[in-house]
Amino acid sequence: MKAFIVLVALAMAAPALGRTLDRCSLAREMSNLGVPRDQLARWACIAEHESSYRTGVVGPENYNGSNDYGIFQINNYYWCAPPSGRFSYNECGLSCNALLTDDITHSVRCAQKVLSQQGWSAWSTWHYCSGWLPSIDGCF
């Protein structure tokens, strides 16, 4: 019983992977990273629908065995190297684990690369973001 209590205490003390942002904190951080202001509402919409603004999310396995990582749910078959060592084109040149941290710099840079090569439709949730977008006007 003591061992169980110790294990529970250790599990609770262990730092959680990632963090949860909100629309405004995401918009401000992305703006500070140089993302054009006219894109910020779209990125906020995508992050809301892909991960609920959570940086530590690994999505369920896709039909082809790949997974999606981080706040923008970036796919490990094309864009990042999975921890399993499975083949990846790794177009962003980074480990998928880099997309799960509190620092969103890698996620933002990789997402911008996805956008430049495939457009907004690279995200399956884009149809939620093609009309009304969340306002970021009060965020700055």
Swiss-Prot record:
Enzyme active site: E50, D68
EC number annotated for this UniProt entry: 3.2.1.17
Tissue: Found in the midgut.
Swiss-Prot/TrEMBL GO biological process terms: defense response to Gram-negative bacterium; killing of cells of another organism; negative regulation of innate immune response
Gene Ontology CC terms: extracellular space
Signal peptide: 1-18
Keyword check for Hydrolase: yes
InterPro entries: Glyco_hydro_22, Glyco_hydro_22_CS, Glyco_hydro_22_lys, Lysozyme-like_dom_sf
Keyword line: Antimicrobial, Bacteriolytic enzyme, Disulfide bond, Glycosidase, Hydrolase, Signal
SS bond list: C24-C139, C45-C129, C80-C96, C92-C110
Alphabetical list of SUPFAM superfamilies matching this protein: Lysozyme-like
Catalyzed chemical reaction(s): Hydrolysis of (1->4)-beta-linkages between N-acetylmuramic acid and N-acetyl-D-glucosamine residues in a peptidoglycan and between N-acetyl-D-glucosamine residues in chitodextrins
Domain C-type lysozyme: residue ranges: 19-140
Enzyme class: hydrolase
Pfam families with a match to the protein in the record: Lys (PF00062)
Keyword Ribosomal protein among UniProt keywords: no
GO molecular function: lysozyme activity
Function per UniProt: Unlikely to play an active role in the humoral immune defense. May have a function in the digestion of bacteria in the food.
Family recorded in the similarity comment: Belongs to the glycosyl hydrolase 22 family.
Protein name (record): Lysozyme E
